[in-house]
């Protein structure tokens, strides 16, 4: 637990520093305008976008965004639910919902605005042209190009690369811990079990990337396919989850 905790705290500090540098020394007014307008557009169009179907949206959009990310979230749900439940022990239902359902999405939208908004700003100002990179799905090239255009240049790109690497490490560690807990049947699985599942996930990802010749297309398809049976497993939580949360809230004197 201490390893995950140290990495997570370091990552939070590094993310705050990077975000502060981008906002203060970058196009501050533009980023502020983008965030306010984007949030207004998002809230105003939430239901129409959430219920969009292939009849009103291009097939490629539904495939690469709606379907893929629905499957992505479904695939992550069981492991993240187990992990969040474990680290939330001792906290109230209200505190957990506040952290997971409110604060985390707000932090995510701010981070997307800082990086994505900076990319849009430099694209519009002619600093670079990401059209070819995005059309060919070279997201790594686009990300590094945007990072090098941020305040700090190469140093900022290196910091973002480090941040991303640690995020992947903490996510993998959390997932292996969740799988080990389920497999062991208790909250304190042996370290070798966590190492085994971490290695198994890394090996599977490497195999899928190798099959896709270094591209993430095969990995994305695998996520979508495996999310189908997982969705059946988590389906009962749609009605058992609220009842469990309500029961806990009553026990904690919140309702």
Please provide the spans of the model-predicted regions.
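Membrane-embedded translocation segments of transport machinery
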Residues: 1-91, 98, 103-157
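Hydrophobic, well-ordered secondary-structure elements that form the walls
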Residues: 92, 179, 218-222
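Hydrophobic alpha-helical segments of multi-pass membrane transport proteins
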Residues: 15-26, 107-117, 158-178, 197-201, ...
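Membrane-interface alpha-helices at helix entry/exit sites of multi-pass transporters
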Residues: 93-99, 185-198
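Short helix-loop-helix connector
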Residues: 88, 183-184
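Re-entrant/interfacial helical elements at transmembrane boundaries that shape
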Residues: 7, 101, 176-182
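Short, Lys/Arg-enriched, Gly/Pro-containing loop segments at transmembrane-helix junctions
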Residues: 121-125, 245-255
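A generic transmembrane alpha-helix motif of multi-pass inner-membrane proteins
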Residues: 31, 41, 56-57, 66-67, ...
